[in-house]
Amino acid sequence: MKTKKNFLNYCHDNAFFGIIQETHLGEMSPGFLVLEGHMRIAFDNDLYLKLQSENIIKRVNQFGDKLYLEFGGKLFDDYHASRVLPGFLPDSKLKMLLTIKDDVEIVIAISAKDIEKNKIRNDIGINYESEVLRLIDAFRSSGLFVGSVCVTQYQDVPVVNTFIKKLNNLGINVYKHYVIEGYPHCIDKIISEDGFGKNDYIKTSHKVVVVTAPGPGSGKMATCLSQLYHENKNGIKAGYAKYETFPIWNLDLKDPINIAYEAATADLADVNMIDPYHLNHYGKLTVNYNRDVEIFPVLKSMFTAIYGKCPYESPTDMGVNMAGFAISDHEASDEASKAEIVRRYYETKVLLRNGKTTENALEKIKLLMQSLNLNEESRHCVLSARKKKEDTGTESMALELSDGTMITAKTSKLLLAPSALILNALKYLAGIPDDIPLLSVQIIEPVSNLKINVLGNRNPRLHVNEVLNALAISATTNPLAQLAISKLHELRGAQALSLIHI
């Protein structure tokens, strides 16, 4: 079940990062606390799809032979967007592409630096190499054509070459783009044989070339620019446009939605800023981010070389994003975005302890929180988790359902805290009294013994996936277990926090 997988991945990577503690069913106290209010829809997804498709088609028709469309964010599962814009569907961008799929070709960019350091996509817990393979399979399964993979900032190191060889063995075309000294400011060198000219020319066969990546900082824009240089040399009139949800250009610079984007990219040191080119030409304030503003002179010079005149007056003009016009409840989006910023703060604290980010990233998020008068407790589940820990004297966890109900669980002998939390949540959703166990000790203990005595694990406590497997087996004879499983989809949109020691 897709919903189950997404929720479990969210729990494992964003709530407690695998360093989870245990809760024993027999010792669970009632954990249902109803808060005022519920999750409000803030975004009209149908309107967004309509507006976005119309705008992309308009941009495609603006250019001649080919359009390079840089896709920012995540195509299949943009959960950041769905968290800060409740009502936004994670696969909206994919649905957009499918409306023009006969004209679309996918190129996936991945940075050699990310391959070398084994960078992880934190929301689903896999490295960028695996994410590239997952994207290829997902695109092809959806009916989209994947033309190639571009390794940007290529370095001749074993781990990078091994990945390239793996792709080649799978029949996937791979191209190399190199580090260009002085990029992005030395325009004369960049637009020369010693710049983009030394990059491989990616051979494409469709009118719309979508350039995407496993995550930010992968070199999507540079890949597009390099291709424009090569297409021009080959006599092909190619254009460029950018499809990125955040920052939302027609919202305020300090809108919580845009600040949440800065929090999400704190490790990249991205900064939202007023687009000076747009302000100078149109006299209007719009929001973009530093990398787009910095690269605009390069783009403008390239377009001037190709067409004699640049078709864009500003970085904002390059974009096609219509998300800002589909926000239906700004108050709800503000609340969701503020909660997301605090969630990113806790996530970054754990990443820092595990050596996977920098102190600067955490300090940046602290400053962003201060700018909106937020603190560590400006998220409902934080208060509930802390109160549970104070009441029980042990590691605790809290989960907020979409209707505002707070579910809690604590550490104990046979179950990890998230495992017990899931069972508590399912019992609440199914209307099962708290004192009725979904899984008996007779079911849990044999699994625990198997882990310790046969598989050699030191921790006897059941993980979430093990508990759900046991629950599924129990459902064949236990109607309550079957009822609980039927409620799994209602965990979509849940917010969780675990207070544990690392």
Per-region residue spans from a language model:
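Glycine-rich phosphate-binding P-loop
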Residues: 208-228
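Cysteine/selenocysteine-centered motifs that mediate thiol-based redox chemistry or coordinate metal-sulfur cofactors
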Residues: 433-495
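Long, basic/Gly/Ser/Thr-rich N-terminal segments
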Residues: 35-176
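Conserved nucleotide-sensing/catalytic segment adjacent to the nucleotide-binding pocket
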Residues: 251-294
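Short beta-strand-centered segment that lines the nucleotide-binding/catalytic pocket of NTP-utilizing
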Residues: 235-249
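Conserved mixed alpha/beta catalytic, RNA-binding, or beta-rich assembly cores of soluble enzyme
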Residues: 73-105, 110-126, 248, 252, ...
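Conserved small/polar residues in nucleotide/adenosyl-binding loops
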Residues: 500-502
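N-terminal pre-Walker A segment at the start of P-loop NTPase domains
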Residues: 179-196
